[in-house]
Design a protein with these regions (language model features):
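Intrinsic-disorder/low-complexity signal
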Residues: 1-215
Length: 215
């Protein structure tokens, strides 16, 4: 397993043993905001509605299609969105995805060269208020995403998102969207490059307009 940081890469087409992979999952995970209380007691929980999306682009970095909770399947049926999570983890990290993007690599239509992964705040909650966020890339023996605490996926990579307030490109302060990274074709295989660029973009459309600058 690879612990990704900005600029890190992982092969999506083969596992650590060189076995060919046909289906991989991108699981986004985040926590609800704890508020109030004293010394860890009392207080409440504020639901956090983040949205995971993917943007498919051609070799010229032009958008072909976006898959998100309102359009769950790509036109070639290679990419599927699990659905909208409106809350986040309310009792700490439960080891499961809040939203999952499944990708069948061999079914992606040939004109797609890049698949960018995005996470943005639907309710415009700032990232520096959210206790944790992360992405993991994995496979499963049954071809299904992780929806049970006792699941044992084969994790290819983890990307724990950390606030670096000293880096204007990745700081969480005042930001509500992040370009997690992108998958790309290379020598007949699919690779993934982690980015972690944050912004104050308030919609998927705004992010789509700036995406080519990061790829």
């Amino acid at each position: 397993m690879i612990n990704l940081s900005k600029g890190g890469r992982v092969n999506l087409s083969k596992d650590d043993n060189g076995n060919k992979l046909s289906k991989v999952f991108f699981g986004a995970n985040w926590g609800a905001i704890k508020s109030g209380g004293f010394l860890g007691f009392g207080g409440g929980t504020e639901a956090v509605d983040l949205d995971a999306s993917v943007v498919l682009m051609d070799a010229n970095k032009r958008k072909l299609e976006t898959v998100y909770f309102g359009h769950k399947d790509s036109s070639d049926r290679a990419i599927h969105h699990s659905g909208d999570d409106l809350v986040g983890d309310t009792n700490g990290d439960d080891g499961m995805d809040n939203e999952t993007i499944s990708v069948e690599l061999d079914r992606i239509r040939p004109e797609v060269e890049y698949v960018a992964f995005i996470l943005n705040s639907y309710r415009h909650q700032r990232f520096d208020k959210i206790p944790y966020m992360g992405l993991r890339i994995y496979t499963t023996t049954d071809g299904r995403p992780v929806t049970r605490p006792n699941s044992n996926p084969n994790v290819l990579a983890k990307y724990n998102l950390d606030n670096d307030s000293n880096d204007p490109d990745t700081t969480f302060v005042g930001r509500e969207a992040i370009i997690l990274g992108y998958a790309y074709r290379k020598d007949g295989e699919w690779k993934f490059k982690a980015l972690g660029n944050t912004g104050s973009w308030q919609s998927i459309g705004e992010i789509e307009r700036v995406l080519p600058n990061f790829i």
